[in-house]
Amino acid sequence: MTNIRKTHPLMKIVNNAFIDLPTPSNISSWWNFGSLLGICLILQILTGLFLAMHYTSDTMTAFSSVTHICRDVNYGWIIRYMHANGASMFFICLFMHVGRGLYYGSYTFLETWNIGVILLLATMATAFMGYVLPWGQMSFWGATVITNLLSAIPYIGTNLVEWIWGGFSVDKATLTRFFAFHFILPFIIAALAMVHLLFLHETGSNNPTGIPSDTDKIPFHPYYTIKDILGVMLLILVLMLLVLFTPDLLGDPDNYIPANPLNTPPHIKPEWYFLFAYAILRSIPNKLGGVLALVLSILILVLVPFLHTSKQRSMMFRPISQCMFWILVADLLTLTWIGGQPVEHPYIIIGQLASIMYFLIILVMMPVASTIENNLLKW
């Protein structure tokens, strides 16, 4: 009798994706972040579901409903902080996952990579709308500033912004629709993640060397299931350290002040995981130019496969490209720092230089480094 996991229509899908999946024998811990993102998504959907049971998406009661969750609902405080800090863990894993893809040349799987970029955009949209829901000062002003950016679109901009707002300012209609979208998007993300996996399993995983590993594959279970469980345990450990010891470390104190349209906070800034893009937006003195730079800072990932000039896939044996990659990482950390600083000297010029460097490294320096390395191979 054949094993049920290989014959049952549903079990067969699970088996081919998580049990008998042929996997390269040498993939490192950098390949753990895919499964960690899956865990983060499940965690966010579950905690979010329980929060939605007690939350009210009305401007008059939203802030107090979040307070009610933290004070009066059984374990409401831990659910709320797991959800808020879970988003931070989600983005840490996302950035690591994308960084791994860039370093080891995983972007040559075009369909997988492009769906990954769509997933990144969808996750950013979800996180932004979730940040608006507690209806604190930073929620309100963040929503006002970011949605207002669309008014930079020529001709239709103003109409588009008012259409998104559902009125002439960020108000009840905006909050209600953001709650609706914030609830539905994670399920769309889950569906897209399935498609992401589907395309990945068409080609099989990449590995640190970037060399095809068809001659040396091992089953996913037990080798990588146990490795993933270790990753998940570390993720939960870090998350719970954050939640139980410093739950507000990554948040903004201004969000504990109820939203007030008549009082602008001194420094409007998004959550830490958007600061790099926010710094790029602010570094251009022109509104439309800033918006374009903001969008391109993420969409530039779509161009990466076409900018790959190297004869080798991975950066493992390419020291000049490695150097460029780590300069890019340092540049992104600089942008993240600048995004949280006020708009004054010397932060303005640092932000502008870091923004120029960001695009220069990806569009010019990395392809040039690859070409130099190709020529060095001939020596």
Curated annotation (Swiss-Prot):
One of its GO terms (cellular component) is mitochondrial inner membrane. The chain crosses the membrane at residues 33-53, 77-98, 113-133, 178-198, 226-246, 288-308, 320-340, 347-367. A ubiquinone binds at H201. InterPro entries: Cyt_b/b6_C, Cyt_b/b6_C_sf, Cyt_b/b6_N, Cytb/b6-like_sf, Cytochrome_b, Cytochrome_b_C_euk/bac, Cytochrome_b_N_euk/bac, Di-haem_cyt_TM. Keywords: Electron transport, Heme, Iron, Membrane, Metal-binding, Mitochondrion, Mitochondrion inner membrane, Respiratory chain, Transmembrane, Transmembrane helix, Transport, Ubiquinone. Binds 2 heme b groups non-covalently. The keyword Transmembrane applies. Heme b b566 binds at H97, H196. The keyword Phosphoprotein does not apply. GO terms for biological process: mitochondrial electron transport, ubiquinol to cytochrome c. CDD domains: cytochrome_b_C, Cytochrome_b_N. PROSITE patterns: CYTB_CTER, CYTB_NTER. One of its GO terms (molecular function) is ubiquinol-cytochrome-c reductase activity. Its cofactor is heme b. It is found in: Mitochondrion inner membrane. Heme b b562 binds at H83, H182. It is a multi-pass membrane protein. It holds the Pfam family Cytochrom_B_C. Heme 1 (or BL or b562) is low-potential and absorbs at about 562 nm, and heme 2 (or BH or b566) is high-potential and absorbs at about 566 nm. Belongs to the cytochrome b family. Component of the ubiquinol-cytochrome c reductase complex (complex III or cytochrome b-c1 complex) that is part of the mitochondrial respiratory chain. The b-c1 complex mediates electron transfer from ubiquinol to cytochrome c. Contributes to the generation of a proton gradient across the mitochondrial membrane that is then used for ATP synthesis. The cytochrome bc1 complex contains 11 subunits: 3 respiratory subunits (MT-CYB, CYC1 and UQCRFS1), 2 core proteins (UQCRC1 and UQCRC2) and 6 low-molecular weight proteins (UQCRH/QCR6, UQCRB/QCR7, UQCRQ/QCR8, UQCR10/QCR9, UQCR11/QCR10 and a cleavage product of UQCRFS1). This cytochrome bc1 complex then forms a dimer. This is Cytochrome b. It comes from Capra cylindricornis. The lineage of its organism: Eukaryota, Metazoa, Chordata, Craniata, Vertebrata.
